[in-house]
Amino acid sequence: MRLLLIAVALASALGAGRAGAAEFRSAGESAVILYDAPSVKARKLYIVNHGYPLEVMVQVEGWIKVRDATGTLAWAESRMLNPARTVLVRAAAVNIRQKPADDAPSVAEVRRDVLLGVVEPAAGGWIQVRHRDGATGYLRAADVWGD
């Protein structure tokens, strides 16, 4: 019986798919200060600019522990974070494509650390994004961080 329960739990965890995917938020309307503890009296570590994607690790009253694109863990005031999704380009340079296919025409080229808005979350290995200049298209999800 115990082995059956373990097998069921393991199958459930493996089948979670997108439901178990990481949760992300973005830095709100202004720059967000990241702290080493959940308090404004804690040591200030650094600041992230508007729109920067942050992975949610833990939420406690008024605070969210986040991970940035470099893997650094810090605390942010939850009121300073926005549910709007953004991603950072990780590849040296990639083309935003008209359709989710490697042979689709390019709409724009973007370089590492460019911030893009998420139009549609990743599906089939591609994510639909929007550049601040208005260009909209698809990138491979592996080429960005934040989804």
Predicted segments, located by residue:
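Bacterial N-terminal signal peptides
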Residues: 5-15
